[in-house]
Amino acid sequence: QLVGVVGKDFPDDLVQTMRGRGIDCDGLEVADGPTFHWEGRYTDDLTSRTSLKTELGVFADFDPKIPEKFRSTPFVMLGNIAPELQIAVLDQVKSPKLVVADTMNFWIDGARPALEKLLKRVDVLVINEEEARQLTGKHHMIQVAAKLLEMGPKTAVIKQGEYGAWLFAGQHVFNAPAFLLEAVDPTGAGVSFAGGFLGYVARAGN
């Protein structure tokens, strides 16, 4: 089940591809205006990036409306959008079992109060190492994780690109290495990881 907004410039064949894979796109709104656009420059080792341009497009005026048939979903993945919108989505869902949220430097810098409010309502925060340090003001990984959990989430997943990811939950710590692949463009890799993480948890039912 997908909820979001795109502009009329968004290719319909991509929507049909998602539908063809069993994704219910009834929550996808097509609005007048351009689709969200981001540009960035990656370091040579692809482990960090500099945002060059963030154009919200139709996201700037997006008011998410969750279809009634979506509202009882047990698992919610709050994708990387404005924290105010993530909260608006969460307000419309009925008692989910697990809420996972993603965020990025743009929102940490520009919408921190709303982000801090959101973090008190999510179960799992998925965030990359650089942004975790930015959000917490800490550097050492143990201190970073402790601060993240103090902000609200029960679990923090800190992504480290080609080095895998760390999961922190209370006194539990788990490290998962990455499969080494030739990276062509890492844009969206973190979001795909977060979605795959929640998809597996939902399928496992644990």
PLM feature spans:
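A structural micro-motif
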Residues: 23-26, 96-98, 122, 154, ...
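Acidic, amphipathic alpha-helical patches
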Residues: 66, 115, 183
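Structured loop/turn residues at beta-strand edges in well-structured enzyme cores
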Residues: 71, 120, 151
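Structural beta-sheet core signal
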Residues: 2-4, 101, 158
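Conserved beta-alpha-beta core of the PfkB/ribokinase-like small-molecule kinase fold
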Residues: 75-146, 164-165
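Conserved phosphate-binding/catalytic region of the ribokinase-like
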Residues: 139-206
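Short, acidic/turn-prone active-site loops that include or flank metal/cofactor-
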Residues: 30-32, 103-107, 130, 179-182
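Conserved N-terminal subdomain of the carbohydrate kinase-like
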Residues: 2-77, 91-96
